[in-house]
Regions:
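C-terminal His-loop and adjacent cap/lid subdomain of alpha/beta-hydrolase
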Residues: 25-521
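N-terminal leader/targeting segments
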Residues: 11-12, 143
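Intrinsically disordered, low-complexity sequence elements enriched in Ser/Thr/Gly/Pro
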Residues: 1-2, 21, 92
Length: 521
């Protein structure tokens, strides 16, 4: 049974069970009164189960028709899809980083709060808060991957921490996803639009089904700089801590940050910029941004060379393949017809069709909007040669991950990540952390660890077509428990290590440091 209150305000390591303290039960009345003047379109309801087993926990895709200020969402209707298609996709978002709900034995009754930030003039910034009736005094604040919504972590993180008694908060980095501009145009139909999939190649593997669908990502707009990603991670922590105190009548004792991909970036920045708000963080394949090393250096190389690699029948010795490998990418996994030798599947092809071009387009338009994306070609973008143009270096520098962490941080990353290649992403951030402290790690309170998941990749669902891969989620969740034990019980964090295919994080690893092989059969 769900009791709902809607207020139109203008505003595998196992920890020993922690005894759950007595506290007031959270209720929507007191929460709503507190959030008046801070939130808009606030919805608060008590649920018998805050896990995703309950269909009400995660809203349906495209279930929002307006911005939080009441203005209608933009977009055109194509292919029978609603005009608001793409702006708000919670169900899709939770499955991007996880294959499904984290199995837990019992329901978690409590209060869920959904709202927008009153302070955002664009009407896009949103958050969700979950307060279990039985609370352990602690809070988890989640980042959001890609351009995903505040429900991005529902499977991987919310389902994992709520049964342990944590309150949970998440946000959308202050920005919605995308809206449809056109379907059917061969060329770019409007400035700042990106096509969802690249066009199919003659004689190649099937391409993405939406090569003629053009969308506009909200976060390329001038009033949505990537610097807001850090702002909303910190703002959500403050808001959730204050609301939890009202809900339970007691202050939060510990706050942890978790997040994946761009959400992992938010975790890193939280440890760098918000040590007064957090006790530690786990970043799962977080995005590394540096003026001289970022995905705009690597991705165009892959976009440019993949068609030639495919035309060479996915020959790993082809010049195109060697160019992609030289850009830091892990090796491809190719499945072939045993009788004909023709490729039937390619890991790189999946990334090319679904991520490489559209991510290049989006990031280039954000940091270097004067480049002619589809006239000159996304694969021909040369970031380093354009650093001297007005605004490019400054906009990247404003979002740099410095490595100057002030609270304990664990990075968990897959060696087969072909969107954020581990050589130039997770390992680069590890180098930044070490450089900031001259290698002196364990003698500091803000310890850092990098746990590399051998054969793990960026997209958990790819383990189905490519069973050679392994999921990262179990290691990320284990890392969270290890972090909590370290912060609260002074337990030693296992050293940075290569987690062998099918293994777990070990106190005495067989392979400390980086994985010698990115892929093992």
């Amino acid at each position: 049974m769900i009791k709902r209150v809607v207020a139109p305000f203008c505003a595998a390591f196992v920890l020993a069970p922690f005894p759950l303290a007595a506290h007031a039960a959270p209720d929507c009345g007191s929460i709503g009164n507190f959030l008046a003047g801070k939130a808009v379109i606030l919805s608060c309801f008590h649920s018998d189960d805050l896990r995703t087993n309950n269909s009400r926990t995660t809203p349906l895709n495209n279930s929002m028709a307006t911005f939080t200020n009441g203005a209608p969402l933009p977009g055109v209707s194509v292919l029978g899809l609603p005009a608001n298609f793409g702006s708000f996709t919670p169900v899709t978002d939770r499955g991007v980083i996880s294959n499904g709900p984290t199995p837990t034995p019992a329901a978690v009754p409590g209060v869920q709060v959904e709202a927008g930030f009153l302070s955002d003039p664009t009407g896009q910034a949103r958050f969700v808060l979950r307060f279990p009736d039985t609370w352990n005094g602690k809070l988890v604040v989640a980042g959001a991957s890609g351009t995903r919504s505040e429900y991005n972590g529902d499977y991987a993180w919310s389902d994992y921490v709520l049964p342990k008694g944590y309150a949970y908060a998440s946000q959308n980095k202050g920005v919605l996803n995308f809206y449809t501009v056109n379907f059917g145009s061969v060329g770019q139909p409007a400035p700042d639009s990106c096509r969802v999939n690249p066009p199919p190649r003659v004689g190649g593997l099937p391409g993405g089904a939406l090569s003629l669908l053009w969308v506009h990502f909200y976060d390329v707009d001038p009033d949505k700089p990537f610097t807001q990603w850090t702002q909303y991670m910190l703002d959500t922590a403050k808001l959730a801590q204050a609301t939890a105190k009202v809900a339970y009548g007691k202050p939060v004792r510990r706050t942890y940050a978790v997040g994946t991909s761009n959400g992992g970036y938010q975790v890193r920045r939280a440890m760098e910029e918000g040590p007064n708000l957090f006790d530690g963080g786990v970043d799962w394949e977080g995005t590394y941004i540096d003026p001289t090393e970022n995905i705009l250096v690597d991705l165009p190389v892959a976009v440019r060379n993949f068609p030639a690699y495919e035309a060479a029948n996915f020959d790993p010795n082809s010049q195109a393949a060697q160019n992609i490998l030289a850009a830091g990418f892990p090796p491809d996994i190719v499945h072939r017809n045993p009788s004909m030798g023709a490729a039937t599947a390619s890991l790189w092809a999946n990334y090319y069709n679904e991520f490489w071009e559209v991510t290049t387009c989006q990031w280039q338009q954000r940091f270097d909007p004067t480049y002619d994306t589809f006239g000159a070609g996304p694969g021909n973008y040369d970031y380093l040669s354009r650093l001297g143009l007005p605004g490019v270096a400054d906009s990247v520098a404003a979002t740099t991950t410095t490595g100057k962490i002030k609270k304990p941080l664990i990075t968990v990353a897959g060696t087969m990540d072909a969107l954020l290649p581990i050589k130039h992403q997770a390992r680069a951030y590890e180098d930044a952390v070490n450089a900031s402290r001259k290698g002196n790690n364990d003698n500091r309170n803000a310890q850092y660890r990098l746990y590399e998941v051998q054969n793990g990749n960026h997209i958990e669902s790819y383990v189905t077509p490519f069973p050679e891969l392994v999921p990262i989620q179990p290691a990320a969740q284990q890392a969270f428990d290890l972090l909590v034990a370290h912060v609260e019980n002074n337990a030693a964090l296992p050293p940075s290590q290569c987690i062998p295919k099918g293994g777990t994080i070990a106190q005495v690893p067989a392979q400390p440091g980086n994985c010698a092989q990115l892929f093992v059969p």
